[in-house]
């Protein structure tokens, strides 16, 4: 179980590295566009200064206009390619982030399931100890109930039950409740006018739940 969790953590680290690299690519592409724009501003300024210092004839002005148009479309084409690259990297980044988020949720769910399976196994091993405490305390005579030994055993029992309750373990209600096969295990049926039909008349062994999962069904007698 520990090896599996280490592998999941390693995969999460690798996913984070991929996302960080994609973010760096997007930032680099943005910086390239800023530098290109700054270069265009410098070029335009230089061209304007040169134009103000010289006097061109009509044919020269026409030729310069043609060059400016070619330069404009060339710069626009470069900018469009950079925008496409940024869009491509941004899309890839968003996909990787979505995949990582799904991976993280799936990993957390698997960790929770693994923890609950392990906790349920431990609780199943503790329940017979609870049963023995209850049988022992039920067998104590009236004269012995006030003895220090019995009171000490009772305190240990209550402490154990309180600890389990704090961990999410709770007892299943049975006696006097309507029979529910999801929580109760009917081991005996009887006729009893005191109870209505399909009502639990007696509980032979307590049932327990861990959070929303049944650890042990209540062993009961049901009225027909």
Swiss-Prot record:
GO molecular function, one term: unfolded protein binding
Biased composition (Acidic residues): 31-62
Protein origin, superkingdom: Bacteria
Keyword annotations: Chaperone, Cytoplasm, Stress response
Biological-process GO terms, alphabetical: protein folding
Start and end residues of each stretch annotated as Disordered: 27-77
PROSITE patterns according to UniProt: GRPE
Subcellular localization, as worded in the UniProt entry: Cytoplasm
Family annotation (InterPro entries): GrpE (IPR000740), GrpE_coiled_coil (IPR013805), GrpE_head (IPR009012)
Regions that span the bilayer: none
CDD domains in alphabetical order: GrpE
SUPFAM superfamilies the record matches: Coiled-coil domain of nucleotide exchange factor GrpE (SSF58014), Head domain of nucleotide exchange factor GrpE (SSF51064)
Gene Ontology annotations for the cellular component aspect, listed alphabetically: cytoplasm
HAMAP family per record: GrpE
Summary of the function given for this chain in its UniProt record: Participates actively in the response to hyperosmotic and heat shock by preventing the aggregation of stress-denatured proteins, in association with DnaK and GrpE. It is the nucleotide exchange factor for DnaK and may function as a thermosensor. Unfolded proteins bind initially to DnaJ; upon interaction with the DnaJ-bound protein, DnaK hydrolyzes its bound ATP, resulting in the formation of a stable complex. GrpE releases ADP from DnaK; ATP binding to DnaK triggers the release of the substrate protein, thus completing the reaction cycle.
Quaternary data: Homodimer.
Cited NCBIfam families: PRK14140.1
The family this protein is said to belong to: Belongs to the GrpE family.
Protein name per the record: Protein GrpE
Organism: Lachnoclostridium phytofermentans (strain ATCC 700394 / DSM 18823 / ISDg) (Clostridium phytofermentans)
């Amino acid at each position: 179980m520990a090896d599996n969790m280490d592998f999941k953590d390693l995969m999460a680290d690798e996913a984070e590295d991929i996302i960080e690299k994609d973010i760096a690519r997007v930032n680099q592409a943005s910086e390239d566009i800023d530098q290109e724009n700054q270069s265009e501003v410098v070029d335009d300024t230089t061209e304007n200064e040169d134009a103000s210092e010289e006097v061109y004839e009509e044919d020269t002005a026409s030729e310069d206009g043609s060059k400016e148009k070619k330069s404009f479309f060339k710069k626009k084409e470069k900018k469009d390619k950079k925008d496409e690259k940024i869009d491509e990297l941004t899309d890839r980044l968003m996909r990787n982030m979505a995949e990582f988020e799904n991976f993280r949720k799936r990993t957390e769910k698997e960790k929770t399931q693994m923890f609950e399976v392990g906790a349920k196994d431990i609780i199943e091993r503790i329940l017979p100890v609870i049963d023995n405490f209850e049988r022992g305390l039920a067998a104590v005579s009236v004269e012995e109930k006030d003895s220090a030994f019995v009171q000490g055993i009772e305190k240990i029992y209550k402490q154990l039950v309180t600890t389990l309750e704090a961990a999410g373990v709770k007892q299943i209600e049975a006696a006097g409740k309507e029979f529910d096969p999801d929580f109760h295990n009917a081991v005996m049926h009887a006729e009893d006018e005191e109870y209505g039909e399909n009502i639990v008349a007696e509980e032979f062994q307590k049932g327990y739940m861990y959070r929303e999962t049944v650890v042990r069904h209540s062993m009961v007698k049901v009225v027909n």
